[in-house]
């Protein structure tokens, strides 16, 4: 969406650096209500991952190298802009430098048998959680 750009001589960039779309999900509902609003294939894939033993873990800076390997693979696979690892290191640093600002940055990694499959940066504030960056491996996609 390019709201108000015609009068300001602004143009959309050739590629998106941050998410181009936003979905608002009400997390005050119970799990079954949230799942029922999803497409059947999405529900199936979530339940399949649970049955197969995929675990999602919140990690700190120690997970950054794993994140970056998945992120690099994702960016190369999809032709996305690739930030340097220092960009993501600074995201964590800003969280720790300002612990009272009400914002929390979490790095979540999904593992199967200690093998990292996917990862995401989740930014939490008082009333919102934003899935900011995601990454996944090309292997074990079933």
Regions found by a protein language model. Name each.
Residues 2-141:
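A conserved beta-strand-loop-helix scaffold within acyl/acetyltransferase catalytic domains
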